[in-house]
Amino acid sequence: MTLFIRPQMWVLLLILPALAAGCSSSPERCGAEILLSWAETKQLQQDVEVLASPRLQGRRSGTQGATLSREYLTERFEQIGLQPLTSVFPPLAETLSGFQHSFNYVDGFADARGINLLGWLPAAQPTTEWRLLIAHYDHLGDRGPGFYPGADDNASGVAALLAIARRVKQAPSRYNLLFIASDAEEPGLYGSKALVSALQQSGFAEHISLAVNLDMIGRPGLPYAIYLEGSRYFRHYDDFSAALMAGTGLCIRPSHPRPIGRSVQRTDWLRASDHYPFHQAGIPWLYFGVPAHAQYHTRDDTADRLDYPFIGAVAEAAEQLLRLPTKQLQNR
């Protein structure tokens, strides 16, 4: 997650858990326990542990750790049965090589190159409508003594993406689904920006009815609490969020904490992660994430600190969102 913080925002980060208690979802609407129907917590944990391991050295974009991450994710894409997008939409194919979508960006004063991974699954019946699921795999890398594991940010989201892909492979959707492990989110959302630009230039974007972003879904600040950003843009948000809570035991809350007093400004969650380029392109989006916690962007964001049943519940909720009938995605 790339945190865009307005003046004096760090004060608010310390009180976000308290703010969450005052969000619109009341306690009685939240389940007493996590309910899982298909998510496998052992596989989720295995994927996180690999991505957050010392061998991958924090997965900084452009490093050997990032290359090793892609090798692992490519193997997982193939195991699941995801297909490269190259043969589906010819205008987009020229930017792709297998699962890889390469792009250039400027990191500080240096030219840099990133690589997104894209795999797709066809709908149960032929359709031109697409849904997207995105989770960034890059993190901060190795800075000084030790590396930044990035277990919650964002190995948790990538592990959930893989779990959802496996589920959809077993039980196809009525929509084509594109799964994106994006690169260079941390330095400035460069992977998602490049991808959205390619989708627009190729004409692919007009076929997308929903993009779901998973970024930091492993450490609930309150029991079973997850923010689902994007509620301002969906007429039926309250209806489908209530259904997701009933089915998973999650406490789903709109991610709009109010400022307190005159001096505290709120986080700009709109620009905080890979959903923002989709927003700029006019593509409907929803974003699952937890607030920044004490281990955010530290060497202590490790795999052993995560709540894997919680990640599984978020994965199941996101999978249900990707199956929503288009009529439920109407804007306010």
Describe the predicted segments one by one.
Residues 293-332:
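His/Asp/Glu-rich mid-to-C-terminal helical/loop segments that flank catalytic regions of hydrolases
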Residues 119, 133-188, 318:
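Alpha-helical metal-binding/catalytic segments enriched in His/Glu/Asp
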Residues 182-287:
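Metal-dependent peptidase/peptidase-like ectodomains
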Residues 59-121:
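A non-catalytic alpha/beta surface segment that caps or lines the substrate-entry region
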Residues 20-22:
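C-terminal motif of bacterial Sec signal peptides marking the signal peptidase cleavage site
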Residues 27-68, 80-86, 100, 294-301:
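N-terminal capping segment at the start of a domain
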